[in-house]
């Protein structure tokens, strides 16, 4: 008998998603499709398999940006090929996430060319270069648009290259591996990313070690741990007001200013990087912003992907998270769907999901591809 819990988890696979459900393999969704506050690309091919993407908007302006790039990961024709996945969860506004979406992949390609190969050092250099570029933009716009100093983005990157998976994370987005765990072919969820959120004790300890003379480096405020009592994440690209003292002053709004002058950055942009050798039992990767993980556990997400057809599976994950969000507020999912952006943020965050299947099939392609998550949802955001 199917358990109630399992039925609830995989139910998105058994019922129609809603308006715009038509997602047959032959349908043309080259640039994705838009259905209200939902953008999705149900299926696509990368160099070693297939992928599925979905984004749902909650904020008045979409703060999540994302991309999937498959093909050369170097500026040289002789360089390696890879599949690159980026999930950029903005806060304070969309500007930093949008900037990272435009610049990080290029910077990593540039350093891959210089170093003649992929490595953790190449990725770190790409993050740091993108950070410096954005802080330069903040400097340029400081007098006319000071609020840009309070904008940042959590950045999660995955690169599949030459049989290795490189995972780089700065912030609290997450990537989870679905892996065959036993002879019965059951899939186990394995988290591959390290998160930087002050709710995690090890993150608080790291901050205290880095700032031993600051008793207020982490503060418990309204039952939530925050860096300097302001922000939950300890690493990001952007958030210039907590990295350079020159931005910790007027005309920045008082709620973003810290009372003490600081000499070294309070937040960092350098990611934590792990390298994972891909094995035959490794089936797929789920990359998602924290909006998904607020409502689904790692294992629940893996079970959904394992139980659903590949086509449209990212959209199924988004629906499962929204169903949980509605349940927590004791409302119907159909009523949640009717709530407009902005107001919707009181019920859930922007959610980005990219599912990447790892092993080559008949659907794999050597043709370079580039997909930006969000499509027309992102087009409403202001250009810097």
Swiss-Prot record:
* Keyword Metal-binding tagged: yes
Which positions are annotated as binding Mn(2+) 1?
Answer: 89-90
Residues annotated to bind Mn(2+) 2: 89, 290, 349
Entry's Gene Ontology molecular function annotations: metal ion binding; protein serine/threonine phosphatase activity
Reaction(s) catalyzed by this protein? O-phospho-L-seryl-[protein] + H2O = L-seryl-[protein] + phosphate; O-phospho-L-threonyl-[protein] + H2O = L-threonyl-[protein] + phosphate
* Post-translational modification Phosphoserine, affected residues: 78
Keywords, comma-separated and alphabetical: Hydrolase, Magnesium, Manganese, Metal-binding, Phosphoprotein, Protein phosphatase
Q: What is its EC number?
A: 3.1.3.16
Q: How is the cofactor bound?
A: Binds 2 magnesium or manganese ions per subunit.
**What superkingdom does the record give?**
Eukaryota
What is the top EC class of this enzyme, as a single word?
A: hydrolase
Check the record and name the PANTHER family matching this protein. PROTEIN PHOSPHATASE
Q: What is this protein called?
A: Probable protein phosphatase 2C 48
Q: Which organism encodes this protein?
A: Arabidopsis thaliana (Mouse-ear cress)
Record gene name: PP2C6
């Amino acid at each position: 008998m199917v358990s109630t819990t399992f039925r609830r988890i995989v139910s998105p696979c058994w019922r129609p998603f809603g308006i715009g459900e038509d997602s047959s393999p032959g349908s043309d969704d080259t640039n994705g499709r838009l259905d209200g506050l939902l953008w999705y690309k149900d299926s696509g091919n990368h160099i070693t398999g297939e992928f599925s993407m979905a984004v749902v908007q909650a904020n008045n302006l979409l703060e999540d940006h994302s991309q999937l790039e498959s093909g050369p990961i170097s500026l040289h024709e002789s360089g390696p090929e890879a599949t690159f996945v980026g999930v950029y969860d903005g806060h304070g506004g969309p500007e930093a996430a949008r900037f990272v979406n435009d610049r990080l992949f290029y910077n990593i390609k540039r350093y891959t060319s210089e170093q003649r190969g992929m490595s953790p050092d190449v990725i770190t250099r790409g993050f740091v270069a993108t950070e410096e570029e954005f802080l330069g933009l903040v400097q340029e716009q400081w007098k006319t648009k000071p609020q840009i100093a309070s904008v940042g983005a959590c950045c999660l990157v995955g690169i599949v290259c030459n049989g290795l998976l490189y995972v780089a994370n700065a912030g609290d987005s997450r990537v989870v591996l679905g892996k065959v765990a036993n002879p019965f072919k059951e899939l186990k969820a394995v988290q591959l990313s390290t998160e930087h959120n002050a709710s995690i004790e090890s993150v608080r300890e790291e901050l205290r070690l880095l700032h031993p003379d600051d008793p207020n480096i982490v503060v418990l405020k309204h039952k939530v741990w925050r860096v300097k009592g302001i922000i939950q994440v300890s690493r990001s690209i952007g958030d210039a007001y907590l990295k350079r003292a020159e931005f910790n002053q007027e005309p920045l709004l008082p709620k973003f200013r810290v009372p003490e002058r600081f000499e070294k950055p309070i937040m960092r942009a350098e990611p934590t990087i792990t390298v994972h050798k891909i094995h035959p039992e490794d089936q797929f990767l789920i990359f998602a912003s924290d909006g998904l993980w607020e409502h689904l556990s790692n294992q629940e997400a893996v079970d959904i992907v394992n139980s659903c057809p590949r086509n449209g599976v990212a959209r199924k994950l988004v629906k499962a998270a929204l169903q949980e969000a509605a349940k927590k507020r004791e409302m119907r999912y159909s009523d949640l769907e009717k709530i407009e952006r902005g107001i919707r943020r009181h019920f859930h965050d922007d959610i980005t999901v990219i599912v990447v299947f790892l092993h080559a099939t008949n659907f794999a392609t050597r043709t370079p591809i580039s997909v930006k998550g969000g499509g027309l949802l992102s087009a409403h955001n202001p250009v810097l």
